[in-house]
C-alpha cells in the first residue's frame, strides 16, 4: 500500500504538467478567437458604414444593396461582400496577429511561470510529505520493534511468575509439613517436660526425706536431740519448739536464736495448735497489710508479728537449716469453714551455698490434711516477686497474679495474693488454695508455721 501511494505521488507531477499544458492551449485559443471575432465585427461595422455613406451621397440606383456574408467556402476569409454585379469582396485577417500574439505569448509565459512555481511548491510539499512519511515509517517500525520486545519481556515475566507460583506452592506445602512437625514436637516436649517435672518431684521427695539432707545436716549445729529440753544450762532457744519445751506455752512474740544467726530475731509462737511449738512465718487475716511487695521486702520480712506479716525468706531459711522441719498451713473461708495442710518435709534454700542467689527454692513433700495438696507442685521452685522473675512462665507470675510466691507456671496456691474477701471475678489473683476453694475464691485467714519433725524430739 505504501509503494502504491509512492507511485501515485511520483506520477502526480506528470499528470499535472499535462493538465497545465492543455489549460494553457485552451486559454490561448479562447483569447485568439475573442480577438479575431472583435476585429471581424469591427471591420463589418466599418464596411457597413462605408457602404451606407456611399449610398447616401451617390445617386440612387436601382441596383440591389450588397450582401455581406461570412464565407464558408474560404476558411481564410472572415467576411465576404457580394456586390450587385455578383462580384465578391473577401476581407481577410492577418493570421500572424502582430499585436495580439506577443501579448498572448507574454501571458502564456506568465502562466507557465506561475505553473512552474506552483509545480515547484508542490514538489517541495511532496518532498516534505515524503520526509514526514519516511519519519512516520521509521517511528512505526521502532514502535513495532518495541512492542515485540515488550511482548517477549511479558512472556518471560509470565514464565517467571509461573515458576514462582510453583515454588510458592511447594514452600507452602513444606511450611505446612514443618508446622505439623513443630506442633508434634511441641506436644512431645510438653509431655517430656511433664515427665521430667514428675521425676524431679519424685527426686525432691526422696531428697527431702532421705540422704540429700546430709549436706544440710553438715551445716547444722549438733543434733537437737542432744540438747536438753527447756534450753537448760542457759542455752538460747533456736525456735518456738525450744521455748514450748522449756515450759512457756502461751501464744505470743518470743525471741529465737538460730544456730547460724546467734544475734537472733523475734517471731510469733503458736503454742496451742496440734501440740504447740509452731514458729509462724506468714499470716493473713484482715487485709491490713499490702503483700504486693518487692524482693527486698520478702527477703527481710514486713508487717506486724501479732497481725498480718511475712517473717522473711532469710529468717525462714535460717530456721529450716537447723533440723528436719514440717510445715502446717491453716485456712479459713468467709463462712468460717476451716481446713489444714501438713507437709512433713519442708525447707527454704536447704541445699544452697548462697540461698539468695539461688532464689530461696522451696522443698516440700509428704502431704496430709483436709485442704488438699496445692503446694506440692511448687516444690523445687525459686521465689518470684514483682521485681524479680524466677518462674517458668513467659510472664511474671507475681505481677500477673498480684502476689509473690514459689511460682512455677504459674500456681495452684497463692497465699500472698490480694485480700479479695471471698468470691471474685478476676482469676487466681486472690489468696487462693485451689484444691479447697478453687481459683476464684480469696480466703479469709491463712497461717503458715513450722516445727521440727517429732521423731527428732
Swiss-Prot record:
UniProt keyword Ion transport present: no
GO molecular function per UniProt: chitin binding; metal ion binding
Disulfide-linked positions: 240-269, 397-410
Domain of life: Eukaryota
Residues that hold Ca(2+) according to the record: 389, 391
Transmembrane segments: 34-54
Residue numbers on the Extracellular membrane side: 55-457
Site (Implicated in ligand binding): 401, 411, 427-428
InterPro entries (alphabetical): Fibrinogen-like_C, Fibrinogen_a/b/g_C_1, Fibrinogen_a/b/g_C_dom, Fibrinogen_C-term_domain, Fibrinogen_CS
Positions of glycan attachment: 233, 336
Region named Disordered: 1-21
Compartment annotation: Membrane
Signal peptide: none
Topology feature Cytoplasmic, residues: 1-33
One GO cellular component term: extracellular space
Membrane topology: Single-pass type II membrane protein
All residue ranges annotated as the Fibrinogen C-terminal domain in the record: 231-454
Keyword terms, alphabetized: Calcium, Chitin-binding, Disulfide bond, Glycoprotein, Membrane, Metal-binding, Signal-anchor, Transmembrane, Transmembrane helix
Function comment: Acetyl group-binding receptor which shows a calcium-dependent binding to acetylated structures such as chitin, some N-acetylated carbohydrates, and amino acids.
Quaternary state and interactors: Homotetramer; disulfide-linked.
Name by which UniProt lists this protein: Fibrinogen C domain-containing protein 1-B
Gene name of the encoded protein: fibcd1-b
Amino acid at each position: 500500500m505504501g509503494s502504491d501511494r509512492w507511485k501515485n505521488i511520483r506520477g502526480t507531477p506528470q499528470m499535472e504538467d499535462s493538465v497545465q499544458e492543455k489549460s494553457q492551449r485552451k486559454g490561448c485559443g479562447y483569447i485568439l478567437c475573442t480577438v479575431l471575432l472583435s476585429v471581424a465585427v469591427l471591420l463589418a461595422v466599418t464596411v457597413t458604414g462605408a457602404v451606407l455613406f456611399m449610398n447616401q451621397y451617390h445617386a440612387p440606383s436601382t441596383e440591389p444593396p450588397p450582401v455581406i456574408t461570412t464565407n464558408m467556402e474560404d476558411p481564410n476569409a472572415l467576411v465576404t461582400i457580394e456586390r450587385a454585379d455578383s462580384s465578391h469582396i473577401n476581407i481577410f485577417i492577418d493570421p500572424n496577429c502582430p499585436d495580439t500574439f506577443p501579448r498572448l505569448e507574454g501571458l502564456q509565459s506568465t502562466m507557465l511561470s506561475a505553473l512552474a512555481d506552483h509545480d515547484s511548491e508542490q514538489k517541495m510539499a511532496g518532498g516534505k510529505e515524503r520526509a514526514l512519511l519516511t519519519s512516520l515509517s521509521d517511528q512505526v517500525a521502532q514502535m513495532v520493534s518495541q512492542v515485540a520486545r515488550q511482548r517477549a519481556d511479558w512472556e518471560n515475566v509470565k514464565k517467571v511468575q509461573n515458576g514462582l507460583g510453583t515454588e510458592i506452592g511447594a514452600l507452602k506445602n513444606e511450611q505446612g509439613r514443618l508446622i505439623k512437625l513443630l506442633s508434634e514436637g511441641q506436644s512431645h516436649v510438653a509431655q517430656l517436660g511433664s515427665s521430667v517435672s514428675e521425676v524431679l518431684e519424685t527426686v525432691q521427695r526422696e531428697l527431702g526425706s532421705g540422704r540429700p539432707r546430709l549436706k544440710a545436716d553438715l551445716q547444722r549445729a549438733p543434733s537437737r536431740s542432744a540438747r536438753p529440753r527447756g534450753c537448760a544450762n542457759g542455752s538460747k532457744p533456736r525456735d518456738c519448739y525450744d521455748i514450748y519445751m522449756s515450759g512457756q506455752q502461751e501464744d505470743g512474740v518470743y525471741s529465737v536464736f538460730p544456730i547460724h544467726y546467734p544475734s537472733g530475731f523475734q517471731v510469733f509462737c503458736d503454742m496451742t495448735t496440734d501440740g504447740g511449738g509452731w514458729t509462724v512465718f506468714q499470716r493473713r487475716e484482715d487485709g491490713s497489710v499490702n503483700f504486693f511487695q518487692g524482693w527486698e521486702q520478702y527477703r527481710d520480712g514486713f508487717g506486724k508479728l501479732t497481725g498480718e506479716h511475712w517473717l522473711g525468706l532469710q529468717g525462714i531459711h535460717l530456721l529450716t537449716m537447723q533440723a528436719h522441719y514440717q510445715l502446717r498451713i491453716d485456712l479459713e473461708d468467709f463462712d468460717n469453714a476451716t481446713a489444714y495442710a501438713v507437709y512433713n518435709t519442708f525447707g527454704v534454700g536447704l541445699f544452697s551455698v548462697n540461698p539468695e542467689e539461688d532464689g530461696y527454692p522451696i522443698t516440700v513433700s509428704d502431704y496430709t490434711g483436709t485442704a488438699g495438696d496445692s503446694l506440692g507442685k511448687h516444690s523445687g521452685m525459686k521465689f518470684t516477686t514483682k521485681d524479680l522473675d524466677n518462674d517458668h512462665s513467659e510472664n511474671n507470675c507475681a505481677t500477673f497474679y498480684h502476689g509473690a510466691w514459689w511460682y512455677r507456671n504459674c500456681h495452684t496456691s497463692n497465699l500472698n495474693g490480694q485480700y479479695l474477701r471471698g468470691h471474685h471475678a478476676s482469676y487466681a489473683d486472690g489468696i487462693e488454695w485451689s484444691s479447697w476453694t478453687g481459683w476464684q475464691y480469696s480466703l479469709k485467714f491463712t497461717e503458715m508455721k513450722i516445727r521440727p519433725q517429732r521423731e527428732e524430739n
